[in-house]
């Protein structure tokens, strides 16, 4: 990440899913924007053509576990194996934990193989209380140079 460059980093979690990924890809293409997609291995298994399209369009891909596991509910080894299983399909050195948290033991285990990427701005596009205009206004208000947006 070059802090001298005026840029933000757009990321998407939990896909690929047919309900939204094609629209996202089309929009990114339209504006010639690249993003990083943190994908769930099981979704990549179900929708391999969407995964292939993300890669073909030149976007970065990251691992978001195979089953979208929360690390506090599972043994460290179980969680780590889920991440490694996802990487058999995703082939990435980037990792983002579901919900943005993980145990310290999981962090220390995974950081040996992965660059762990978090964020500093959540769009809350999933909220039923916000419309598209609210989401855009929040991003405009809180984004700064180098922000990682999810």
Language-model features: locations:
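An active-site-proximal "capping" alpha-helix that borders the catalytic cofactor pocket
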Residues: 79-90
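A short acidic, helix-capping loop that chelates divalent metal ions and anchors anionic groups
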Residues: 68-74, 125-127
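Conserved active-site loop/cleft motifs that coordinate metal ions or position small ligands
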Residues: 148-150
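Glycine-enriched alpha-helix->loop->beta-strand junction motifs that scaffold or abut catalytic
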Residues: 31-34, 57-61, 110-119, 145
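His/Asp/Glu-enriched short active-site or ligand-binding loop at hydrolase and phosphoryl-transfer sites
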Residues: 93, 101, 106-142
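Metal-dependent catalytic neighborhoods of phosphoester/phosphodiester hydrolases
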Residues: 49-50, 72-80, 106-109
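Active-site beta->alpha N-cap acidic-glycine motif
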Residues: 1-70, 91-92
């Amino acid at each position: 990440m070059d802090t001298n460059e005026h840029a933000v980093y757009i990321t998407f979690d939990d896909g690929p899913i047919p309900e939204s990924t094609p629209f996202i890809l089309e929009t990114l293409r339209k504006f010639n924007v690249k993003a990083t997609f943190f994908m769930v291995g099981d979704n990549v298994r179900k929708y391999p053509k969407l995964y292939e399209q993300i890669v073909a369009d030149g976007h970065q891909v990251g691992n978001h576990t195979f089953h979208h596991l929360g690390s506090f509910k599972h043994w460290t080894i179980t969680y780590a194996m889920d991440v490694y299983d996802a990487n058999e399909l995703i082939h990435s050195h980037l990792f983002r934990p579901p919900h943005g948290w993980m145990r310290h033991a999981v962090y220390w285990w995974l950081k040996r193989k992965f660059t762990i990427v978090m964020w500093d701005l959540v769009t809350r596009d999933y909220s039923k209380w916000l419309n598209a205009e609210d989401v855009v206004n929040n991003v405009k208000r809180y984004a700064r140079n180098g922000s990682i947006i999810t």
